[in-house]
């Protein structure tokens, strides 16, 4: 069974990173910075997301329907190496989310970020394909969250079984206090 377009089914875990870190040798490293709440500065038009009259991204009919039908969105602007991705994400169940994404020019991303500061996190992500074919994303957080390591795996269905790597710890799927947004908001409150 294929996951419907714009749907994401994933499980999340705390990683035991006290000793060996085998995901570093097995995966590609990507630098990521994520800013939350940028959607407050965006307007949703018939066919575009705009910021102060400037088009940020084109919106398809299907995306527009989702934006109209769902009211509980988390908005995120992610810098992944040199690429910026704007995301609207809404949790449907503990492990399933509706996710809309657009690539944004670096110029427009900088314009959006000028409205901040926004709650944010920085991390290095290692993308690891295991022998069973599952792709794990292992995030080593930086800054005030240094030492925290989380992992997630995307699935085709909520009941799909997956073999856990030896470094996987406690499952945190569906625990909102462990979402990247919640971590970013906690850091923002503590630094205020």
PLM features: what roles do these ranges have?
Residues 1-192:
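Phosphate-end processing signature that detects enzymes handling 5′-triphosphorylated RNA
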């Amino acid at each position: 069974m294929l996951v419907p377009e714009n749907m994401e089914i994933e499980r999340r875990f705390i990683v035991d990173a006290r000793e060996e870190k085998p995901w570093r040798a097995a995966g590609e490293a990507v630098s990521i910075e994520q800013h939350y709440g940028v959607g407050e500065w965006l307007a949703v038009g018939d066919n575009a997301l705009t910021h102060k009259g400037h088009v940020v991204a084109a919106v398809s009919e299907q995306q527009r329907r989702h934006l109209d039908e769902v009211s509980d969105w988390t908005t995120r602007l992610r810098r992944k190496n040199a690429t910026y991705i704007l995301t609207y994400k809404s949790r449907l169940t503990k492990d399933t989310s509706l996710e809309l994404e657009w690539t944004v020019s670096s110029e427009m991303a900088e314009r959006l970020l000028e409205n901040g500061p926004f709650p944010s996190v920085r991390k290095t992500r290692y993308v690891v394909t295991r022998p069973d074919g599952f792709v794990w994303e292992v995030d080593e957080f930086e800054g005030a969250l240094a030492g925290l390591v989380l992992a997630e795996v995307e699935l085709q269905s909520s009941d799909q079984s997956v073999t856990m790597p030896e470094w996987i710890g406690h499952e945190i799927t569906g625990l909102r206090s462990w979402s990247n947004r919640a971590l970013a908001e906690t850091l923002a409150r503590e630094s205020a």
